[in-house]
């Protein structure tokens, strides 16, 4: 299990750690071979608060949603379909974004 920070505009995750890094970790990546994996938003209130504070920055590089920027009254993020990432040139890169919804 690898914990990833946000994905930038090029689809590259800005950091990857073996443990959750408060204030940075947004996604959890599951991989068997270290080359390809599936990722989802980490399901904790702390990550939801951070990601919902600026979804354009924290979520848009790795997620799709019906209305990603509309977070009024939202307190949780649910991953409906995990995204896919590949390890390339020493970094994890988004192949397919995860689909999320807010609650």
Residue ranges and their predicted role:
Residues 34-103:
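Extended, amphipathic alpha-helical stalk segments that mediate dimerization
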Residues 1-54, 85-86:
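Charge-dense, E/K-rich amphipathic alpha-helical interfaces
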């Amino acid at each position: 299990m690898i914990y990833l920070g946000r994905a930038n505009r090029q689809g590259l995750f800005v950091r990857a750690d073996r443990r959750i890094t408060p204030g940075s970790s947004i996604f959890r990546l599951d991989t068997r071979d270290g080359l390809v994996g599936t990722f989802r938003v980490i399901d904790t209130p702390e990550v939801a608060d951070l990601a919902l504070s600026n979804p354009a920055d924290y979520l848009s590089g790795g997620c799709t949603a019906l209305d990603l920027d509309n977070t009024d009254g939202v307190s949780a993020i649910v991953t409906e379909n995990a995204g896919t990432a590949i390890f390339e040139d020493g970094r994890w890169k988004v192949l397919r974004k995860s689909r999320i919804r807010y609650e």
